[in-house]
Amino acid sequence: MLSKLARLQTVAGLGLGVHSSVASATSVATKKTVQGPPSSDYIFERESKYGAHNYHPLPVALERGKGIYVWDVEGRKYFDFLSAYSAVNQGHCHPKIVDALKSQVDKLTLTSRAFYNNVLGEYEEYVTKLFNYHKVLPMNTGVEAGETACKLARKWGYTVKGIPKYKAKIVFAAGNFWGRTLSAISSSTDPTSYDGFGPFMPGFEIIPYNDLPALERALQDPNVAAFMVEPIQGEAGVVVPDPGYLVGVRELCTQHQVLFIADEIQTGLARTGRWLAIDHENVRPDIVLLGKALSGGLYPVSAVLCDDEIMLTIKPGEHGSTYGGNPLGCRVAIAALEVLEEENLAENAEKMGIILRNELMKLPSDVVTTVRGKGLLNAIVIRETKDCDAWKVCLRLRDNGLLAKPTHGDIIRFAPPLVIKEDEILEAVEIINKTILSF
C-alpha cells in the first residue's frame, strides 16, 4: 500500500506526463459568420477565449442529439460512441425522460431539504426497492456520491466498528477515477489529476487493482473502514478484473469487518449488460454509488445506497446538499430508471456488446492490439507509431461520422447509448474498420 507522498515521489522519478502526441486543435476563425448560426470554428475560439482550459475536447461543436446520434452546428450527423461517459444510456433526449422533466419543471423545481417535497419520497421508495437497500442519500454529481460514501464509511468506522477517532482509513485501487475534488484526487494514481494540488487527504491508501492478496494485506489494519472500487475501471481504459475478483472482495471485506463500496457511477444502470456491474458476480456491496445515467443525461442526479446500520450513523445537519433530492431531479430519475426497465436496456447492452466485441476483434492486430469490455462498455488499445495514435484515430473517426475519445493515451473507449440496434452497431463498425484501415 502506498501513501500519496510515496506515490508522488515514484511518479516524479518516472517523469510521467500527458500523452505527448495530443496536439492542439487547428487555429480557428476569429469572427462570427455575418449571417446564420455560429460556425464550429467560432465556437471553438469563443470557449478558448472565455472558458477555463481544463478540458481538451475533440474539435466538434454539437447542437442536437437524438437516440444514438448527435449533430454538429453545420448539420453533420455522428454516431455517439461516448454517451457522455455513460450518462446517456437511454439515448439522447429520450422522450419519456424529457416529458417527465417538462411535467415537473413548471410545478416545483427546488425546495432545498429545509422542507419536504412530494416527489423525493416517491423516488426514494422506488430506487431503494429496485436495488434492495434500506436507504438512499440523494446527491447531484458522481463525485458528491463518492465524497458521501467516504464520510459514511468514516462515521460507521467510528460509531460501529470502533476505530479510534480520526484514525479511520479507506483503501482504493490504483487506476481509479471518481472525480476531481481534493478527496477524489487524493486517492488517484494519475499525475494529471493530482500533481500540483497537494497536500492530500489523510487516511487514504492505495493498492493494485484486481489483486486480492494485496487487499487481504491491506485489510489486516484494524483501522481500515472501507474499500472503494469500480467493478470495471472506466477512465483507466475499461479494465475488466479477473473472474472472481468481486466475490473475493466481498469475502475479504466481510471477514475483516470492512465496508465494500462499489462505485457504479459509470458501470451501473445497464451499461455492462446487468443492472449493476457487480451483478455479473452476484455480490452485494455495503454501499453502492449511482450517477450519470440515473438522469438519462438531462440533469445531474447521483445516489448513495446502503442499509440502516451505515446510513443512520449520519444525523440531521451532518451532511447535505441544497439541490440533492430536489423534485425536478427526482422526477427525471424516476423516468430514467423506468426507461431502463421498460426497454430492457441491460439485456440489449449484453447482446449488442457481444456483437460489437466480435466485430472489433476482426480489426487488424498491427493497429488494434487489444479489445476488452462487458456489455456496451468497451475499449480498444491502439499500437502507437509516429503516424498513428488514439487521438489521431479519434479525429479520423470524427471525419467519418463517429465520435469517441481517447483515455490514457493509447486507449479508445466505445460506449454507445444502450438503445442501439444491431444494424446500427454494424454500420458503426464499418466506420471504425474503414478508419483503422486508413492508417
UniProtKB/Swiss-Prot annotation:
The name this protein goes by in its record: Ornithine aminotransferase, mitochondrial
Lineage top rank: taxon: Eukaryota
PROSITE patterns reported in the protein's UniProt record: AA_TRANSFER_CLASS_3 (PS00600)
N6-(pyridoxal phosphate)lysine modification, residue list: 292
Primary location class: mitochondrion
Gene: OAT
Needed cofactors: pyridoxal 5'-phosphate
Location in or out of the cell: Mitochondrion matrix
Disulfide bonds, paired cysteine numbers: none
